[in-house]
């Protein structure tokens, strides 16, 4: 096992512990609490994968951080902070929408890279909006927290979430997963739109009809799907 992988996990465990203390003292806002919960699940997955105990890793992580802070000068800290771009937290969904439980009549799940896509195949002929909470850096989507598909009535019918055992994803991973989710929902004659906020930070543009610009690969895949559906309809007639 790579030593850097272990030390990174140990430091992450300790920093999570520090952030938990902030929340316990009621100093954290809603996005801060949301990231804390998400990172807790991620740390559990990483700990299981690495075979490391989180409590023991936290103590070692504390020693690593204390050693760094002891050697760090105030001037170096100021320069480091000034040169590091700050990420922003973007919220399409409310806390209630983000944390609400939902159920599928005809569940379908697909793993696309480091992301898990879930959708209810029983949903037909609905107008659906994709909304997401995510972080942004340099005006581009950095990390997806959670994406959900909502009907006009407010029901959740689909979701994209990071895999806990596979931390880290790119903006292309997110766009590909969105393409898969849209294709799956449109299969049942649903009309799918993407929120303008998500369009702006994922694709850098906003489409009037609410649809994201698709890659040539996604367009070919959707065209094949449409032709296959037409053939089946003709055979049924």
Curated annotation (Swiss-Prot):
GO terms for biological process: symbiont-mediated suppression of host cytoplasmic pattern recognition receptor signaling pathway via inhibition of RIG-I activity; symbiont-mediated suppression of host gene expression; symbiont-mediated suppression of host mRNA processing; symbiont-mediated suppression of host PKR/eIFalpha signaling; symbiont-mediated suppression of host type I interferon-mediated signaling pathway. GO terms for molecular function: protein serine/threonine kinase inhibitor activity; RNA binding. Residues 205-237 are annotated as: Disordered. Coiled coil: none annotated. GO terms for cellular component: host cell cytoplasm; host cell nucleus. Residues 1-73 are annotated as: RNA-binding and homodimerization. The keyword Heme does not apply. HAMAP family: INFV_NS1. This is Non-structural protein 1. It comes from Influenza A virus (strain A/Memphis/18/1978 H3N2).
């Amino acid at each position: 096992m790579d030593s850097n992988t272990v030390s990174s996990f140990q430091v992450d465990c300790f920093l999570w512990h520090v952030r938990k203390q902030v929340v316990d003292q009621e100093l954290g806002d809603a996005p801060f609490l949301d990231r804390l919960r998400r990172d807790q699940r991620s740390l559990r997955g990483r700990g299981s994968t690495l075979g490391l105990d989180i409590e023991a890793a936290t103590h070692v992580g504390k020693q690593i951080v204390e050693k760094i802070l002891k050697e760090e000068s105030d001037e170096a800290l100021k320069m480091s902070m000034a040169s590091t771009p700050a990420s922003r937290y973007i919220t399409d969904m409310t806390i209630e929408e983000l944390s609400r439980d939902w159920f599928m009549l005809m569940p379908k799940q697909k793993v696309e890279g480091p992301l898990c896509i879930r959708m209810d195949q029983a949903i037909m002929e609905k107008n659906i909006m994709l909304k997401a909470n995510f972080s942004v850096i340099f005006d581009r989507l950095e990390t997806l927290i959670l994406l959900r598909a909502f009907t006009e009535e407010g029901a959740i019918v689909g979701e994209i979430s990071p895999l806990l055992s596979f931390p880290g994803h790119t903006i292309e991973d997110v766009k590909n997963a969105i393409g898969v989710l849209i294709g799956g929902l449109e299969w049942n004659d649903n009309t799918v739109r993407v929120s303008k906020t998500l369009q702006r930070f994922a694709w850098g543009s906003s489409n009037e009809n609410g649809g994201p610009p698709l890659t040539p690969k996604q367009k070919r895949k959707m065209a094949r799907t449409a032709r296959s559906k037409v053939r089946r309809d003709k055979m049924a007639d």
